[in-house]
């Protein structure tokens, strides 16, 4: 997945327009497959709907797309870019210094967005495959829902299985396919609208408001739970800002919006003209002439796969950002593409696959899945509204205007949340359970890191310069390695983790020519790659602070190679010639990376709550990437040392010597 060139971020191009269609609009663009079907089924079927119901439903869809997608996301949220990156975690990095509690909406929003990513592929692919029921030559096969489920699971298995290889080649087809899809939505919807041209009156919000309070509406205000399905992809639109640029979204959204609205109008007109067609039909596929149905099902399936791919890739990006912000466990990641935007996280991939397939097997039909869909994303949108309000205040927007915006969208999205909450007992509990589980994991990881940073002891490195220099020249000890490198996330100025000095001095003393202490600091900018060096007035101690953006790979060995070369060229680091080497001109000696594997001991004297957090974090850590993989050290010389997380002085346990009393004979 490519990232837009920063110089053209606000510009639009023909190529960018097509790319945006393939990346940004998959979710929102496939909503016509199931939204109208959900509305009609909740009303009692096609035979139960009236003209006022159809006009009101389409009106509510149009104004939901306008208020939430167009105004909130396209016009407001897209301005909240973190160095041209969007999404809830990018937004959080912009405002997190304003108040500590903003971590709460960030974690909740990220978790619910991730849980939504597990449901979207299930709904979209199942809806598309169910279209085969109206293909005359295949009806005898796919009228049996078990065959629909089998085909859906097969497509999902292929989709998740190819993630490890990246989408570089086939990804180039996504844009053109989605252009054809949206063109089809618009044209077919427009042509179907001639069956009942009155549907275009739905642009008047009066019909939507009238339906909400009309006795004809069997669901009352809870109809908004189905209406919301039309705009679930709005959050993904913001998340993909960095991939296509603001300019291309601004230009492509009107085209997409018109195509989607025409599709809803066409379906509505067909329903009013065919009220005796049968209650089990999906209006989207039923409104297509039979000779084109097979072609449309294939196109819809491709669009559903592209939408699912966008959600899966978005989930990888979301988790990757959370890991670098230290609010998510560091799972093993690979980069199958040629550019930094393509990330593959095996644990997340197969977690999503397991959840998605379980949802298909549990709910069986797209209609039942729709009953669970939308609840999680309403929570994400509410959390985005909170963070967005703080961003606008930070940018100097008048607090009164920000308050009005927050109240307006808070009430609007709150109503959608309440309308969707009724879905909880009809399947919504599944995504809520997933979201709560993710929130639990993120909270444990975040709190655990805070506990460690609060208790772990730091030492002043200046106090040990003499010992390190003496060790370098102590002939009683053999040379351990020319360069010894310690990676640490706890280095503040000259203060360094006690475990590191314990490893060098108190265990088998590690004699080296140069001691390196490398600390990685993740910046709020996504693509920073800078470093700072402090040699503390010596030529044998090198403190390195690596400043890497939250989207950058933390491949330390490759960055260190560049730093060493620059230090040698500047003369700050003495040359380290090798006697034996395939490179006679080599100026650098051998390197040994020391990775400290910190283990929590249950014997530590912590409060019960803190003990529980640390025990849970230790359990989760078994599933995470090793530091060797995380820091890209697979092909380097590495020693892993297991050290305890020492929160208090390690005192001996009380014990007394047993003395045997001996008696002597008279």
UniProtKB/Swiss-Prot annotation:
It catalyses: K(+)(in) + H(+)(in) = K(+)(out) + H(+)(out). GO terms for molecular function: potassium ion transmembrane transporter activity; symporter activity. It is found in: Cell membrane. The keyword Ribonucleoprotein does not apply. Keywords: Cell membrane, Ion transport, Membrane, Potassium, Potassium transport, Symport, Transmembrane, Transmembrane helix, Transport. One of its GO terms (cellular component) is plasma membrane. It is a multi-pass membrane protein. Its main location: membrane. Coiled coil: none annotated. The chain crosses the membrane at residues 16-36, 58-78, 99-119, 141-161, 167-187, 221-241, 253-273, 292-312, 343-363, 373-393, 402-422, 424-444. Belongs to the HAK/KUP transporter (TC 2.A.72) family. Transport of potassium into the cell. Likely operates as a K(+):H(+) symporter. HAMAP family: Kup (MF_01522). This is Probable potassium transport system protein Kup.
């Amino acid at each position: 997945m490519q990232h837009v060139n920063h110089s053209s971020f606000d510009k639009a191009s023909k190529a960018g327009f097509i790319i945006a269609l393939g990346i940004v609009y998959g979710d929102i663009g496939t909503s016509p497959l199931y939204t109208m079907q959900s509305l009609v089924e909740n009303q009692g079927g096609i035979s139960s709907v009236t003209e006022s119901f159809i006009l009101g439903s389409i009106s509510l869809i149009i104004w939901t797309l306008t208020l939430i997608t167009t105004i909130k996301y396209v016009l407001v949220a897209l301005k909240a870019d973190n160095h041209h990156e969007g999404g809830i975690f990018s937004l959080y990095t912009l405002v997190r210094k304003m108040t500590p509690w903003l971590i709460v909406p960030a974690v909740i929003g990220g978790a619910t967005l991730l849980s939504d990513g597990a449901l979207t592929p299930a709904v979209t692919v199942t809806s598309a495959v169910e279209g085969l029921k109206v293909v005359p030559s295949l009806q005898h096969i796919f009228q049996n829902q078990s065959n629909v489920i089998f085909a859906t699971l097969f497509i999902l298995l292929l989709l998740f299985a190819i993630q490890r290889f990246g989408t570089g080649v086939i990804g180039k087809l996504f844009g053109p396919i989605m252009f054809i899809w949206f063109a089809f939505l618009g044209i077919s919807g427009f042509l179907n609208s001639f069956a009942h041209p009155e549907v275009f009156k739905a642009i008047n919000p009066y019909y939507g408001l009238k339906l909400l309070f009309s006795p004809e509406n069997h669901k009352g205000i809870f109809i908004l739970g189905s209406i919301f399905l039309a705009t679930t992809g709005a959050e993904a639109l913001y998340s993909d800002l960095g991939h296509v640029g603001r300019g291309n979204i601004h230009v492509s959204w009107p085209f997409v919006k018109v195509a989607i609205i025409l599709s809803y109008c066409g379906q509505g007109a067909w329903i009013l003209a065919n009220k005796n067609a049968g209650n089990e039909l999906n209006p989207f596929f039923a409104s297509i002439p039979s000779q084109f149905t097979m072609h449309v099902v294939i196109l819809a399936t491709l669009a559903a796969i592209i939408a699912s791919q966008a959600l899966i890739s978005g989930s990888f990006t979301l988790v990757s950002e959370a890991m670098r912000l230290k609010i998510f466990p560091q799972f093993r990641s690979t980069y199958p593409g040629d550019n930094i935007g393509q990330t593959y996280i095996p644990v997340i991939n197969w977690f999503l696959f397991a959840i998605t397939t379980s949802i298909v097997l549990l709910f069986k039909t797209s209609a039942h899945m729709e009953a669970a869909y939308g609840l999680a994303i309403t929570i994400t949108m509410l959390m985005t509204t909170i963070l967005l309000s703080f961003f606008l205040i930070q940018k100097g927007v008048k607090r009164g205007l920000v308050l009005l915006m927050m109240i307006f969208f808070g009430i609007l999205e709150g109503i959608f949340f309440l309308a969707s909450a009724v879905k909880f007992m009809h399947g919504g509990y599944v995504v809520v359970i997933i979201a709560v589980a993710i929130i639990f994991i993120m909270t444990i990881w975040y709190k655990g890191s805070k506990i460690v940073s609060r208790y772990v002891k730091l030492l002043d490195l200046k106090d040990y310069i003499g010992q390190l220099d003496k060790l370098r020249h102590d002939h009683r000890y053999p040379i351990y390695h020319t360069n010894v490198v310690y990676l640490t996330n706890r280095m503040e100025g000259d203060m360094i983790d006690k475990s590191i000095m314990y490893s060098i001095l108190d265990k088998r003393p590690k004699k080296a020519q140069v001691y390196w202490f490398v600390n990685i600091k993740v910046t709020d900018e996504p693509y920073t790659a800078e470093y700072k060096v402090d040699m503390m007035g010596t030529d044998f101690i090198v403190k390195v602070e690596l400043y890497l953006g939250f989207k950058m790979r933390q491949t330390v060995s490759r960055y260190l190679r560049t730093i060493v070369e620059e230090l040698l060229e500047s003369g700050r680091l003495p040359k380290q010639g090798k006697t034996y080497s395939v490179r006679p001109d080599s100026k650098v000696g051998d390197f040994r990376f020391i990775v400290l594997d910190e283990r929590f001991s249950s014997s530590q004297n912590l409060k019960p709550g803190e003990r529980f957090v640390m025990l849970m974090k230790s359990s989760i850590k078994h599933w995470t990437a090793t530091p060797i993989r995380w820091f890209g050290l697979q092909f380097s010389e590495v020693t892993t040392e297991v050290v305890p997380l020492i929160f208090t002085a390690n005192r001996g346990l009380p014990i007394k010597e047993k003395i045997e009393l001996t008696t002597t004979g008279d």
